[in-house]
A protein has these predicted regions:
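Long, His/Glu/Asp-enriched segments that create or flank divalent metal/ion-associated functional microenvironments
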Residues: 1-199
Length: 199
């Protein structure tokens, strides 16, 4: 169990054998049956979970990524929860930004971790292109599949899942990269403004 400001996240192994099982699934505390947030790591097929991606994904989903972000959600007086879970620009965008931040500040334990971070960034960039072109009917599912495998380092299974996501939630993949770019732009602006005082 990882902990951030008394808001722990439990990392669980799962062995999901569904048709398109996610390798990593993050469940904030509000969506989890457990008293903590849960990060499920699917160990059913280890060939789909390369070690060079694992460290980058732990930054994206754990601390300082999406768990850190969703742990700061506020609960109102009527117990209603302000949730950012369905704002991919904010959640996934922040997660991708933290993976990049870890790369910029040399927090990866090996060059393979950095490689995994770059590959995931490329994957989301490829998904952005597919998301836009699929939903403008400029690309067939078959063409999208080939593109994601060649340009996004996707397995056939993860590419099918990305295509399905783009069909069911148009703009979700685009939103994630838009969020990453927005966080990078904000950082650049404050680096310029603060100079040596930027930390």
């Amino acid at each position: 169990i990882l902990n951030v400001e008394n808001k722990p996240i439990e990392v669980r192994a799962s062995f999901d054998q569904g048709s398109t099982p996610a390798q990593f699934a993050y469940h904030p505390v509000q969506q989890s049956s457990a008293p903590t947030a849960v990060l499920e790591v699917n160990l059913n097929d280890m060939s789909k979970l390369p070690l060079y991606e694992a460290e980058a994904k732990s930054f994206i989903y754990g601390i300082p990524g999406m768990h850190q972000l969703t742990s700061t959600q506020t609960i109102g007086e009527d117990d209603s929860v302000f949730s950012v879970d369905n704002l991919p620009a904010f959640t996934i965008g922040w997660g991708l930004y933290t993976a990049k931040l870890a790369r910029d500040y040399d927090l990866y334990r090996s060059p393979y971790g950095k490689l995994g971070s770059l590959m995931l960034e490329s994957r989301y960039a490829a998904r952005l292109i597919v998301d836009i072109k699929l939903n403008q009917n400029l690309l067939s599912d078959e063409q999208a599949l080939v593109f994601l495998k060649e340009q996004g380092f996707e397995t056939a299974e993860s590419a099918h899942l990305a295509i399905s996501t783009s069909r069911q939630s148009p703009g979700k993949q685009t939103s994630a990269i838009s969020g990453l770019l927005a966080f990078m732009s904000l950082r650049s602006r404050f680096e310029t403004k603060l100079g040596d005082r930027f930390n």
